[in-house]
From Swiss-Prot:
Protein origin, superkingdom: Bacteria
PANTHER family xref list: LIPID-A-DISACCHARIDE SYNTHASE (PTHR30372), LIPID-A-DISACCHARIDE SYNTHASE, MITOCHONDRIAL-RELATED (PTHR30372:SF4)
Name of the protein described by the UniProt record: Lipid-A-disaccharide synthase
This enzyme's EC code(s): 2.4.1.182
GO cellular component, one term: membrane
Recorded coiled-coil stretches: none
Pathway(s) where this gene product acts: Bacterial outer membrane biogenesis; LPS lipid A biosynthesis
InterPro entries, alphabetized: Glyco_trans_19
Provenance organism: Campylobacter jejuni subsp. jejuni serotype O:2 (strain ATCC 700819 / NCTC 11168)
Family: Belongs to the LpxB family.
Taxonomic classification: Bacteria, Pseudomonadati, Campylobacterota, Epsilonproteobacteria, Campylobacterales
C-alpha cells in the first residue's frame, strides 16, 4: 500500500483530490495520506491517518487577506518537510496554491528529499509571473497540467484532461435546452452563486438580493457545504432556496449569476447560461492590473481567448457590478453563441484527469 503526502489547501483542490483518490482506489487499491487536506476525506476513504493541518486553515483570497497566513504557512512547510523524512512517503502531490507549494518544493529540495514531487493544476504563468517557470520545472518531477495550452509555457508539462469534466456527472442536453426556451420568465429558475469566501459573499450578496427581486420564478442560492453553518454572512436569504451541490444547482437552473471562480467554468460545461460578477478590494484590483495581462478573468472566457474564440459569457467587474447591468445582460443574452462555445469547450478540455493522475501516482 502506497502513502502520499498531499497539499490541498483550497476547497476546489480538495474536490479534485477526492476524485483522484476515488480513481486510485478503484484501479490500484488502498492508500494512506499525510499533509494538508479536508478531514472529510479520512472518513470517506477509511484512512488511518489525519491531516497535519486542515485545508480550511489556509483558505484565503486576495493579496491582503493572505498576509495573516504567511507565518502559519512557513511553520507548516517546515513541519511537512520534516514529515517527508520521518514517514515512508512514496510520492508528494501538490495541488494548485503556488504561494504555498512552490516554497514547499524548495524546502524539500534544500533538505535533500528524493521523493518524487508532482504538481497538479499548474500556476497560471500565462496570466502573470512567468519568471516562476524555471523554478517550477527544477523543483517538481512531474507537471500534471489541466489546461491544453500549458505546454506553450512549460517544457515538461503533461496534459491529463480537466478535472471538472470528471466531477460533473450531468450535463444539459438538447431537450433540457429546449425546455428552458419554452418557459415563461416567471417559470424560470435563477441561480445565484456569490462565491465561497466571506469577502466575496459580503460584496456580492447585497447586489444579488436586490437583483433577485426582478425574477418571479424559483431562486436558488448556492452555498458551499462548508458554509452551511455560517449562513449569517449572507444576510436575509429567506426568499432563496438554499442548496450546496454546485453542478446539480447549475443543471436545474435556467440562468445563473456567478462570482468569478471555478463555478463559472462549471456553468459553461454543464450548459447553463450565466453572467460573471466580481468585486474585490480596490488594492487587490490595482495590484492585479499591474501584473495580470488578460482580456478576461473567467476561466471559460480565458480558454476561448487562447483558442482564438469570442468570449463565452459577459463579465462585470467592480463598479460595473450593479443591478441595472446584470439584469440588462440577462435580457440581452446571446444564447445561440453560448451553446455553440459550450460544445467547443468540452471537446477542447477532454475527459480523464482523475484517472490519468491516479495512474501517475501508482507509477512513481
Amino acid at each position: 500500500m502506497k502513502t502520499f503526502l498531499v497539499c490541498a489547501l483550497e476547497p476546489s483542490a480538495n474536490l479534485h483530490l477526492k476524485e483522484v483518490l476515488k480513481a486510485y482506489k478503484k484501479d490500484f487499491g488502498e492508500f494512506e495520506l499525510h499533509g494538508i487536506y479536508d478531514e472529510s476525506l479520512c472518513k470517506e476513504f477509511d484512512l488511518n491517518s489525519k491531516p497535519l493541518y486542515s485545508s480550511h486553515e489556509f483558505s484565503a483570497m486576495g493579496f491582503i487577506e493572505v498576509l495573516p497566513l504567511i507565518f502559519k504557512a512557513k511553520k507548516a512547510i517546515k513541519e511537512l518537510a520534516n514529515l517527508s523524512f520521518t514517514q515512508k512517503i512514496n510520492g508528494i502531490l501538490c495541488i494548485d496554491s503556488p504561494a504555498f507549494n512552490i516554497p514547499f518544493a524548495k524546502a524539500l529540495k534544500k533538505a535533500g528529499s528524493k521523493i518524487p514531487r508532482i504538481y497538479y493544476i499548474l500556476p497560471q504563468v500565462w496570466a502573470w509571473k512567468k519568471g516562476r517557470i524555471p523554478i517550477i520545472e527544477s523543483h517538481f518531477d512531474i507537471l500534471a497540467s489541466i489546461l491544453p495550452f500549458d505546454n506553450q509555457f512549460f517544457n515538461k508539462s503533461t496534459y491529463i484532461g480537466h478535472p471538472l469534466l470528471d466531477e460533473i456527472k450531468e450535463f444539459k442536453n438538447q431537450e433540457d435546452i429546449n425546455h428552458t426556451f419554452s418557459k415563461k420568465d416567471d417559470e424560470k429558475t435563477i441561480a445565484f452563486l456569490p462565491g465561497s469566501r466571506r469577502s466575496e459573499i459580503r460584496r456580492l450578496m447585497p447586489i444579488f438580493k436586490e437583483l433577485s427581486q426582478k425574477f418571479k420564478g424559483k431562486k436558488i442560492l448556492c452555498v458551499p457545504s462548508f458554509n452551511l453553518e455560517k449562513l449569517e454572512v449572507y444576510g436575509d436569504i429567506s426568499e432563496f432556496k438554499i442548496e450546496s451541490n454546485t453542478p446539480k444547482v447549475l443543471k436545474k437552473a435556467d440562468f445563473a449569476f456567478i462570482c468569478s471562480g471555478t463555478a463559472t467554468l462549471e456553468a459553461a460545461l454543464v450548459g447553463t447560461p450565466f453572467v460573471l460578477a466580481y468585486k474585490a478590494k480596490a488594492i487587490d484590483i490595482f495590484i492585479a492590473k499591474l501584473f495580470v495581462k488578460l482580456k478576461h478573468i473567467g476561466l471559460a472566457n480565458i480558454f476561448c481567448d487562447f483558442a482564438g474564440k469570442e468570449a463565452l459569457n459577459p463579465e462585470f467587474l467592480q463598479d460595473k457590478v450593479n443591478v441595472l447591468n446584470l439584469y440588462e445582460a440577462y435580457n440581452k443574452y446571446d444564447y445561440k453563441a453560448f451553446f455553440a462555445k459550450v460544445d467547443f469547450l468540452k471537446e477542447y478540455l477532454q475527459f480523464g484527469s482523475a484517472k490519468n493522475l491516479a495512474k501517475i501516482l501508482n507509477e512513481i
